[in-house]
Amino acid sequence: MNEGLIPKRYAKALYKFALEKGETKRLYATMATLARSFDDNAQLAAAVANPFVDDSRKTSLLMTAAGADASDTVYADFLKLLTQNRRLGYARECALAYLDIYRHENRIYPVAIVSARPLDADEKARIEALLAKHLPGATMEYSYSTDPALIGGFTVTVGSERLDATVANELKQLSLKLLAK
């Protein structure tokens, strides 16, 4: 079976279950924390993939990694289902698929802004206002980072769309024009 299909099916079923329970937003935060934990800690993925670590320990690790407690029954039930079906190894992919589904259903766009230097609050506000004008009614999740290689300016990535307003890009375009002549 397709490796990407399994997590998507589980995530879709989880979203429907969370919707019935009125827990989609809470579960979104839990899954976002879980995905970040996997990204930040390679040992978590190694432990979940390790066949010598028993399932109860893996479940405990995944509860802790997601910042979940006993009151988060939807997430706990989901982990029980993954355990019963021998699919704990797909926990990260299921979390990412759930995030995608939730964002799609709620018109949430992840926005990555990379600049040559840290942006001040006024610059961030102007960029955010411009994006809000182009995507009315949508919610955006902003992440900011810096990359000195850009020389100056910034890039904005919304989903699969990218705006490149960097000095490095301008120099590259100028170079291509000069070489074409």
Where does each model-flagged region fall?
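Elongated, mostly alpha-helical coiled-coil "stalk/stator" tethers of large membrane protein machines
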Residues: 1-181
